[in-house]
Amino acid sequence: MWALLHLRTLVAMAIALVALFVGGVVLQAAGEAKAQSTGKQMTTASGLKIEDTQVGTGETPKTGQTCVMHYTGWLYENGAKGEKFDSSVDRGDPFEFPIGTGRVIKGWDEGVASMKVGGKRTLIIPAELGYGARGAGGVIPPNATLIFEVELLGLK
C-alpha cells in the first residue's frame, strides 16, 4: 500500500513538472511572438515599450555577444519625439556593445535582447531604465524618458 502511494506521488510530481515546463515554454513562445508582432506596441514588466517596425530573420543575440547596431535617440516628451541627442546613422558609424553585460542602459539590454539580426525596433525607455535621476552629460536631463529607433545589423 505504501509503495503504491509513493508511486502515485512520484507520478503526480512528474506530471506537474512536465506541465510546468510545457506551460513555461508556451508562455515564453507567446511572449516572443507578441514582441515580434510588427506594428504593435508592447510594454514589458519593467515599463519598457517595444514596437517592431521590421522583424529580423537572423539570429537572436546571446548574453555576451557583441551587437552591431544603428540607432537614433530622442528625448520623449508629451508622447512624441523631442530633441534628437545622438545618432549612429548620422555619423555613418555603427555602435557595438556586448549584450546583457551592463555596458549600456538597461532599456537597451532588455530591448535588444529579443531582436533578430535584420530587425528594426522602436524603444520607449522610462528614466529608470535609462539615465535616471542623474541624466547624462548635460544632453539628457534628469528623469528623462527616451525614444530610440534601433536596428540590429549583426552579431560578433
Enumerate the language-model features and the residues they cover.
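Cross-family detector of peptidyl-prolyl cis-trans isomerase
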Residues: 2-156
